[in-house]
């Protein structure tokens, strides 16, 4: 938002003004600016972020990753395709749910040759189908954690991802897929620091970007 010489920057994890940015430049650790560039994906954050987002208008500032999924096709397609790699089903934002937007699990809704009297009737039929679908927040921690990582990874304004045990709650095949997704997603301008005890996470990373992987073994001294 532009207010003359003062500008407002709002989004997921940050709400800053141009004066704040100047002030944080003198902070050794950059204050709240860190949240614009660094994503911290511990277990709690991953599970919480998969809960439904508050409903907003299409033009409002996006304050939750699900808002990007709901209102921008590229994010919707990306997260659905990567979720399907692990679980065989797609993710669909339910924007007609009411006061929040959950992520539904199932097939994309397509009406073939059915005729509707108007657009409102078609949307009501679409809504009725999604009401029968499972929702991410009601599933086990494996699906919620996997979805939470995807919701962070798709936001390309982050430069650094701190990911604590991404294999948590996942079976080995899904952990391998997660390693591959992380390796495939990060651009040359991004990096991830991953704490893991999983061979499958490491194997997945090595399968897609071996030249970028550095493995550091930490041994606790008694």
Where are these regions (language model features)?
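Extended helical coiled-coil dimerization/tether regions that scaffold
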Residues: 21-160
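Switch/communication elements of ASCE P-loop NTPase nucleotide-binding domains
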Residues: 114-222
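FAD-dinucleotide binding site
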Residues: 9-10
